[in-house]
Amino acid sequence: MVAPPMAVSPLRPLLLFLLAAAFACHAADGSRSAYGHARGLGVNYGRVADDIPSPHRSVQLLRAAGAGSVKIYDANAPVLRALSGTRLTVSIMVPNEIIVDLAASYAAADKWVAANLLPHLPGTRIKYLLVGNEVLSDTSAATAATVWPRIVPAMENLHRSLRARGVSRVKISTTLAMDALVTGAFPRPPSAAAFRPDIAEPVLRPLLRFLNGTNSYYFVDAYPYFVWAGSNGTVPLDYALFNGGATRYVDPGTGLAYTNLLDEMLDAVGTAMSKLGHPEVRLAIAETGWPNAGDYDQIGASARNAAVYNRNLAARMARNPGTPARPGARMPVFVFSLYNEDLKPGPGTERHWGLYYPNGTAVYQVDLAGRRPLSAYPPLPAPGNDTPYKGPIWCVLAAHAAKKLNETAVGDALTYACGQGNDTCDAIQPGGECFQPNTGAAHASYAFNSYWQQLRKTGATCYFNNLAEQTIKDPSYGSCKFQSSLG
């Protein structure tokens, strides 16, 4: 996508100077950390599921995919023991819930380090300690007042503990989503990006100062999928999948040309850091990827697109790291995720980011080391949902839930759906059109659908604790009519 001709911004020389300075710092730094940069992309190993393989088997699958590192969302001891003796570098995480405690007390931070990190060194190659996950995305008044100001103090206490114990290999940071920027996930042009005013000075300036002083990274969660899916066709799919070819976007502020969406997103973060006086802070991608499936109303979520994105990402990072503003700058990159996680709430895509199904079979082939030529992969299935689905959709009791009915769980979900008012469940009351058959399964399907159809536009999802699923087959029967809405 080529931007229309525009006058050169008077800020362009300053922006180019800052970008050049940032690149100089990155090029000079090279690979200073004790473990160096992993050779293959990393993988996020989430475990919000009840059916995934053991940690030992998971390590085997990570290595089979060519992963060079792994990131977990806690400091789970069995997982860290399974990683011991491997060449995988590891990122662990402090949960959001204890940030305030670690900030208030050095003793608490030191105790956490002693209990959760030290027992696994040096056998497990722990390289990053991330303090919280997307904390700044929670904009509730309570979190903003009590947790945001404590992120950096918690990091400082943990860093002090590591130094006191002679641990110099572990870098401390936190993860931030693209919503830390004023413009959110799609800050175009990148040269105009800036951090949100509610966090720029009180949180991010001290955070960047800490990262710079400890030679650590700004970890960002960057998902081109969501930008593309929400662009209403203004962003080409190939541009989001690294298949842009001649498709380019030129930043009018810097003159830099972009051939893919991820680079735009990363350089926007770099610009925002420069505006706070820290162009030298290095970037890391804490999460990125593409969903391999989703709901009927979720465009482009397919195994084909997921394979193309991750294969191209691995090849790109192996041969041509960096971005237009930071050419050649190597960065840690973690793909989301190792498995499809069946207990993640929200729309269908939330449960379909995995490289592997829960039984350990690959969703698609990928070499995260980027060494396998793209032409050497077997053909992918044809895309089936790269354009929006326009037909009717219903929300019903999921087939797996109906097959092995948990009456208590279904009853709780039914009570929740019917408790929202708006005549949601009138039709399944005695004498109603849908009362028969008088079973929990039949009533649940009606209630789930009625609730979802009424509240879908306000963010409701067809999930109900993994008991519901979308269908395009009309579940109506006899005089019982299920309301529908178009995709």
PLM regions and their residue ranges:
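Terminal membrane/secretory targeting segments in land-plant proteins
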Residues: 1-42, 381-390, 486-487
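Hydrophobic faces of well-ordered beta-strands that scaffold small-molecule active sites
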Residues: 41-45, 68-72, 88-94, 127-131, ...
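Short, acidic/polar
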Residues: 46-62, 106-119, 201-205, 409-413
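Solvent-exposed loop/turn segments at secondary-structure junctions
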Residues: 48-50, 75-79, 96-99, 133-138, ...
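Catalytic domains of carbohydrate-active enzymes, especially glycoside hydrolases
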Residues: 56-78, 89
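Substrate-binding cleft of extracellular glycoside hydrolase catalytic domains
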Residues: 79-180, 186-196, 285
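Substrate-binding and catalytic surfaces of secreted/luminal carbohydrate-active proteins
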Residues: 156-164, 168-173, 181, 194-455, ...
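All-alpha RGS (Regulator of G-protein Signaling) helical domain and cognate RGS-like helical scaffolds
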Residues: 467-479
